[in-house]
Structures are given as structure tokens and as C-alpha cells.
Amino acid sequence: IAAKTAAKNNLNTVLIDDKNILGGTTLFQENECFKINNSYSNEWLKKEIETLKSLENLTIKTRTSLAAYHSYNYLLARENLTDHLDINEKKDKIRQRLWKIRAKKVIIATGAMERPLIFNNNDRPGIILSSSIKKYIDYYGVKCGQKVSLFTNNDSAYETAISLNNSGVNVNSVIDIRDKTNSLIVKQAEKLGIKIHWKSSVVNTSGYKRINSIEIMKLSDDGTAVVGKKIKEECDCLGISGGWTPRVHLFTQSGGKLKFRDEDNVFLPDKSGLDQISIGSCNGDFELDQVIKNSVSSTNKFLKVNNNDYENLEIITSKEIDKKNIWLLPSDKPLGKTKPFLDFQNDSTANDIKLALREGFKSIEHVKRYTTTGMATDQGKLSNMHALGIIAETAGVKMGELGTTTFRPPYTPLTFGAIVGRNVGEFFDITRRTPIHDWHVENKAEFENVGQWKRAWYYPIDNENMHEAVQRESKAARDSAGILDASTLGKIDIQGSDASEFLNRVYTNAWSKLEIGKCRYGLMLNEDGMVYDDGVTTRLSENHYLMTTTTGGAANVLSKLEDYLQTEWPELDVYLTSVTDHYGTVSICGPNSKKILSKVIPDLDL
């Protein structure tokens, strides 16, 4: 809806979807309980997608995920190019491409992710999120089991039950922790003969390499205990659904602040300093009519347009009548004898959270690190909300007061290859030449690369090799004179009333008594006492020095000196200027060097 609105109003738009096809979960929502204009919601959506594809100023990127959202609406998107291909097809092809996007406006519609349920032995093979089971059967025609039980605290699991039933899978029952509700989707499940255990909980699971049975008991009125007899139900798959958590990760990465909604225990986008909005279930709208109505109005207001394409839609949706959260479901066994897993990758449990609180940890960040909850590769997408709920209940505080852990990029993993980029051979780099470079060329010099500089190496005559040329040049320098083009050395102009004191601090030797017109060799160390750089510095006047550095270290030395002046000694009156390119430098050596210099500069007192 947002992409269509933007594109139809002549705004250049990029629509990014991490799936291979557009539409999300609604694309396979072929159910009497979800209709738009007397058509199944998925049929209506398919027509919308066809309209989208015809818009000229809309770029659609599928199999692409926004990995990071930085300041000033700068976004990084990872496009998967070959992960879906056969191993022979993907050979020698790029796996991922990294898109760098600078947007004027950003509309976040990242949806919500299903929560698990936390109960005893909930990490056995064959225990799967209810939405995953539905996706396997609807998208790919794959059955996760032949005898499936579903355990839920909301209506979403009933959609899964109906999809499974329509596909010929035996649905044992739906175990619902709520009191009986009469929403449209529940009534439809009952008409199909699907058995429902109301106000009940799974207290244990069995099975070695795969789940083979579950134990069900009734919940007490307050939901803190289980009562009555156990019911054993054989199954080879258990779907669990603990409600939905808005995906606010990208919003918070951009610097946005969250607010907490007590009604259904979710964190929602609140304040943002960027030109962005969040719409749909990532903004807390979970019902189909809510999503469409609020998305249209928010997008129109945000883009300052008036898209009335969706004004007269007739929407039928199954309204969820009751929502109930029990963060840690009770068991008929004492807490120390149960294994209610919280982080399914790091194997941290609800017991670990309670232990952390007994040990005195109160901050969610401290509990996270003590228990490793939320520190696996999913970065807490499945576990963090339950961890917050258990902490809040145990400590007797409100969830909204606890806050959240930090949402850090990337939202989805990136390969190093995507970050580095493609290999195109040698990259362009500038070439720096000294003022007498042309003279070196005329004298047939061979050059060496020193950083970005071309520095004369040696001057072969006729067919001399490097060794022969260097021997000849060295003998000439010892017997008569030699010159060296030292223009590549870094040069820093240092001025100010505290220039001498500054040099005393950055070099190992003293500079205050150096006479004007004289030079001195200086050795510079870093903080751990290792040699950092060296060079000759000349005193040009009372408060004026010219420092030389090594060729490769010039930029680093200047940066370090600037850092010292700004952070360590801001009281010093010193000004630094890079003058490496301002002056040519020639070193003259050998017994005849004075004679040569006196002819070049006759008035110079040597």
C-alpha cells in the first residue's frame, strides 16, 4: 500500500522484501475469515502486486533484507543472489550484493515475529513455531508431521490448524491457555471438527530423536498452576504460538525510542528524529482491517498526498477477542525439576533468569550477559520478550519500566564478501610526484612506490642492473658528491608561542635551546614506548619550526599531533599545517657538497 501510494504520486520508490515473492503471510491467507471486497484476501493482494509491478518509478528488490539503518536515513540492504540456486548453478557467481541507500523518506513495514511458548521440555525436535508449520504447508506443500498438535495463547494457531486440515494432515487438537472465545477463526476450526482444549497447558513432552507425545493439564483460574488429571496425546509435531512481537529492530537502530503497550505486552515505535514512519504490525496493528486503514492514513499524512484507492474496501476479518500472556507456563513439577528453554540456541532457561535475579542482577543487560539469553545468532528475536516478562513478574515491576536490550546491526547476517565488494583487480589510486620528477625521468631513473609517491630509486647507465648502479652511485657520493630527492618526506609547519614545549613533549629529546637556523634529529614514541616516527626538525624562528617525518608516516603523525593538541594539551598555543606538497627537498652529501652548494647559493654562509 505504501509503495503504491508513493510511486503513483511520482516519488522514486524502492520496495524491499526479504522473500522471493511479495505479499508476506497474506499471500496464502485463503480463508473465509479474511476477505476484501468479497474476495479472499490473498486474491485481492495478488491484483495489488500486479499493479505494483507496472509502476515505472518503483524498483522492487526481492530476496533482499535491510541489514542496518543508520543516521540520516542511510540504509544497508543485503541482496541474496544465489542462495536459492542449485549448487552447480551458483558456481563462480556472486552470493550477495550490498546496496547502500540514502533515502529522503523511509516507511518501515517489517511486520511482526511469532513468539514461542515457554514450558517444560519445549526444545525437543519436532516442536516448531505455528507460523512456520503454516508456511511450510502453504508455500512449499511440505508437511511437518502427520499427527500435529498446536499449543497457543492466540488465534494465529487456528489458521495453521485449518491449513493443515485442508491439506489432509491430522490435527490432534489445539491446546489454548485462554478461556473459550468465539472469534470467526475459532468457530471455523470447530466446524471442521478440530478438538480444542480450552484453559489448558502442555506440561511435558516426550520423545528421543523427535517428539512423540505431549502431556496436557488444565490451568487454574489465575493461570499460575495446573490442576486435574493429565491427558497424554500422541503427536509427531507440536506447533507453538505465543503471540506476536513487532519487529522494531530497524527503527531502534536508526535512533528511535520505543513505548510499551500494556494491553498485549508489546514495544512499539514512538519518537524518531529521522524522516520515517512505521506501519502495519511492526507498529502494533495486527488485525487485517487495522493494517489497511492505518497504513493508508499514515502513509498519506507522511507523504502529504491523498490516495483514496482504499476508501471503500469491504473487509471481513477474524477479530481476536481475548489475548492472554503467561510468560512461564506452570508445570506439575517444581521449578528446579523442569527444563523450560528460553533461548533455543544458547540453551538458557527460565530457571537461569530466576537464578540471575536471586544473584542480584536487576538490569536486563546484566541478566542477558549472565545467562547468555539473547546472545545467540538470532540476537534474542525469540527469547527477549519472554525474558523481560519473567524478570518483570519475578521482580514485581512493569515490563515497560525494564526497557529492552540494545538492537544492534546487522539485523540479518552479512557475508564479509558482500561488505568488501567485488574483486576488480587493481583499484585507482592517486600518484604523487616530487617537484623535480621530470628531471628524474630525463636522467632515466627507476622509481619505487613509497606510499602514493614515486621516488627515484637508482639511475642505471647502459645495461647496468640495480646492484651495479647503486655501487657506482655510492662511490660517487663518497668520492665527490651525491644528491637525494627527499621531497617525499612529510613536512609539518609548527607555529605558536608553545611550539618548543610541544616538541619537548612529543619527541624524546629537548628542543627549547635549539638555535634559530639549526636542525635536530628527533625520535617520536607512541604511548607504549615503541618508536612511532623519526625525522629532522628545523627551527626557523623563535616560535616557528619545520618538522619532517617519514614518507609513509606523514598523515598518521599529523593526525596524532592534532589529537594531542585537541584532547591532551588543549591549553598549548600551537598551530599545525601540512606543507609536504609546498616544498621540494634535496639532500646533498659527499666531500664536494659545500663547493656545489656555494655555487648554487653564493651568498650562503657555510
Where are these regions (language model features)?
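Residues forming the flavin
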Residues: 1-433, 582
